[in-house]
Regions:
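Zinc-dependent deaminase
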Residues: 1-17, 29, 78-146
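Small-residue (primarily alanine) positions within well-ordered alpha-helices
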Residues: 7, 11-14, 24, 34, ...
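Short, basic and Ser/Thr-rich N-terminal targeting/leader segments
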Residues: 18-22, 68
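Residues at secondary-structure transition points
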Residues: 20, 41-49, 77, 127
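Short beta-strand scaffold segments in enzyme catalytic cores
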Residues: 22-30
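Short beta->alpha transition motifs characteristic of CBS
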Residues: 33-40
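Residues that line or immediately flank small-molecule/substrate-binding pockets and catalytic motifs
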Residues: 40, 74, 98
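Helix-adjacent hinge/juxtasegments
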Residues: 47-48, 52-87
């Protein structure tokens, strides 16, 4: 199973909890060290995005806030808040499953990860996955029909 498929499993966990279905995994040296999914509604926190929760878990597991050499796999393009956390945690590479035309901050609506005024560079890999899009489309279609 690919790392993006693992992130998708996390997205489906979020969907089961009626959370926006976004999942994330952090990989170091070819092994998953943290997994998370959106929990904003569950935790009543605007900060409980999958990426933020995965970064927090990974930092605790390795005992350092610096996640240099780690890679993040996420089903939806990170927002500005999450892009900022990615930069601050020094994640080396982000693999993105689908675009977010409204709030994506990794090249779609904005490009925070490689902004010329920031002293950082995060490699971005667009790994379009139809299922990453489909889970979001289906989730919002179901919400509108209720």
């Amino acid at each position: 199973m690919s790392f993006m498929e693992e992130a998708l499993k996390e997205a489906y966990k979020a969907k089961e909890k009626l959370e926006v279905p976004v999942g994330a995994v952090i990989v170091k040296e070819g092994k998953i060290i943290a997994k998370a999914h959106n929990l904003r509604e569950t935790l009543k926190s605007p900060l409980a995005h999958a990426e933020i929760l995965a970064i927090d878990k990974a930092s605790k597991i390795i005992g350092d806030w610096r996640l240099s050499g780690c890679e993040l796999y996420v089903t939806l393009e990170p927002c500005v808040m999450c892009a900022g956390a990615i930069i601050q945690s020094r994640i080396s590479k982000v693999h993105i499953g689908t675009f977010d035309p409204k709030a994506g901050a990794c090249g779609t609506a904005a490009d925070i990860l490689n902004h010329p005024y920031l002293d950082s560079f995060v490699e971005v890999s667009w790994e379009y996955n139809e299922e990453c899009s489909k889970v979001l489309i289906d989730f919002f279609k179901d919400r509108r029909n209720k």
